[in-house]
C-alpha cells in the first residue's frame, strides 16, 4: 500500500534568489534518498515561499523492498587452507557476518578469488527510515550562504522555526537543531500569524490559503501576472514585460496583491533605461508604457499583504522612488556637463584587474584588436570602430553608472547622442556589452560587434594569461559567457575570421602582463573556445556530427558551423548508415593526415581498384569546387556517389597486400578518397 510523504520547513525570510535552487535540490535529494533506501515512490514536488520550503511525495511504499546483500571478505587463499578448512581469518569473517564458515561462497573478481556471504535483507517499515532520511535531507540542502543561530550545531539559509513531517498523516519523529517535527504549520506573518494543524498535503494547501499563504510558486506567479496586467489596464497603460522581475517577486511574497503608483513626469527626461532599472533593480517595481511603448510616469508594485487602504502603501512606495529618481536626475544633469572624450583619461585611475592594469590599458588593447577586425572585414568602418572602442568604457567614471552600474554602456550611448557623436558610434558604445546572457540579444551593428568581440577576447586572453581560468562553477570574470558571446556574434554575422589569428593578436597585446608561457596560454584559450563551441553546437546538432567536423576544422567558426549543419542534414539520408560505415573503413585504414602520393594505374591488380580510381576522378573536381563555394551538402552528395565503388573495393581487394608496391598503391588510392572529405569531417567519429 502506498502512502503520502509531506515535509514543510518553516523559517525566517529566505532570500528570493535562494529558493528555486533549494526546491530543485529538495526534489533531487529525496529521490536519491528513497532510491538508496529501496523505497518505491511516485511524483515528487517541492514548493517555496520566503518563509517555508515544502515537499510532497506521492505513492511512497510503506515498506522498504527486500534485497540480497553480498558482503565481500578476504581472499580465498587467506580464508581457507589448502585442504579446504577455514583459517582463523575465514572463521572470523563468517562469525562477523553471523553465518557458519560452510555458508561462505567464492566470488571471482578482477583481483582474484574472494570469499563472500550473500544474505537476504528483509525490508523494514518506511516510517522508521524516514526519521533518518528527512533530517539528513534538510541538512544537505545547500545555499549560497547559510548561517548558524543560537548555540546550535546546524546550518540553514535562515533560522528554522517549525517542521511539519507526515507520512500517511502520521508524524515522522526527528529533530533538526532544537526543532522537533510535528503537525503544526503557521500562517502569514502579518495577516494570520497563528499555528494550524496539517493532516495531509491537500489539507495543507487549503489551510495555508485560509491563513493567507499560497505555497505553490507557480500559482503565485500566475496570480501576480494576472494582477499586474489588470492594474496596468486600469491605470490606462500596458505592462512592460519583465519575466525576470516576475520570477523574483514571486519568491518575495506569500500572498501577493498589486497596487499602482505614480511619479512626476519631470523625471521622464532621464533616459528610460535608467528609470526602468531604478524601479526594477532597487524597488522591484514593474514599469508601465503606453500603446506606442513610451514609458509612462507610473509603476506597479507587489505587496505581501492585503490592505484596506492601498493609498498608504502607495504613498510610501512613491516617496522612496522619488528619492531614487531625484538622485538619477541629479547625476544625469551633472554627467552631461563633461563630454565623454574628456572622461577617457580618467580610466587611467580605474583598476581593471591587479595583474592586467587599468581600464585605460584594457581599452587600448581591445581598441587595437577592434581596429584589426575592422581592417580585415570592413576597412571603411575602422575610424568609427576606433572611436567607439575609445569611448565605450568612459561612462564607468560617470556619476550615473557609479550609482546604477546596470546602465553601463547605455549611459555612454545616451551621453554620446546628447553630444552629437555619430549615431553608429553611440549605439556601438551600448552594443559592445552584448550579449549579456546566453541566447541574449547580439550587437545590431558591425561597429558594435567588432568592439564587442575585441573587448571580450581581451578579457578571456588576459585572464588566461595570469591564471584566472574558470574552474567548475567558479567563473568570476564570466569568461564562459564572453566566449559564447564571441562565437554567437561571429557565427550569426557570418564574419570570416580566423580564431587562431585573433587569439595570437590578443596575446601579443598582453606582452609584459603574462605570468604564464604564451604558448600554453594560446593552447588553453583555443581549447576553451572549442569546448564552448562544441557545447553550443551540440544543443542543435548530433554530438557525433559536431565532433567529426571539429576534429578536422575549427579555426573559421562560420565555416565550421556550415559544415556541421550540412553533415547533420546529410546524416538524415536513409542510406547514410551504410555510407558512413564505408567511409569509416577508409578512415580507419588510412589514419593520420592525408599524404599526397601518386596512384599508379599500372600497379592495379583488381578491377575494383580501377573502378574506384575512375569514380574518384569523376567527382573530385566537382567536390573541390563545392568545397571552395562552401556548399558542403552538395560536396557530400557528390562524395556519396562513391559508395558502390568503395564497397566493391573492400569486398574484392586486400588492401594490405604482401607486395609492398601494390600495398602502397592501394593505400594511396584510399588516401585519395579520404582527401575528398578530409576538410569536411572525420567519418571515423560518426556513429552510424
Curated annotation (Swiss-Prot):
The molecular function GO annotations come to: arginine-tRNA ligase activity; ATP binding; glycine-tRNA ligase activity
Q: Which SUPFAM superfamilies match?
A: HD-domain/PDEase-like
Compartmental location: Cytoplasm
Q: Which keywords does UniProt give here?
A: Aminoacyl-tRNA synthetase, ATP-binding, Cytoplasm, Ligase, Nucleotide-binding, Protein biosynthesis
Q: Where are the transmembrane segments?
A: none
Q: What is its EC number?
A: 6.1.1.14
GO CC annotation: cytosol
Q: Which reaction does it catalyse?
A: tRNA(Gly) + glycine + ATP = glycyl-tRNA(Gly) + AMP + diphosphate
Q: Where is the signal peptide?
A: none
What does the similarity note say? Answer: Belongs to the class-II aminoacyl-tRNA synthetase family.
Q: What PANTHER family does this protein's entry cite? A: GLYCINE--TRNA LIGASE, CHLOROPLASTIC_MITOCHONDRIAL 2, GLYCYL-TRNA SYNTHETASE
Complex and partners: Tetramer of two alpha and two beta subunits.
Cited NCBIfam families = glyS (TIGR00211)
Q: Name the chain's protein.
A: Glycine--tRNA ligase beta subunit
The organism named in the record is Geotalea uraniireducens (strain Rf4) (Geobacter uraniireducens)
Organism taxonomic ancestry: Bacteria, Pseudomonadati, Thermodesulfobacteriota, Desulfuromonadia, Geobacterales
Identify the coding gene.
Answer: glyS
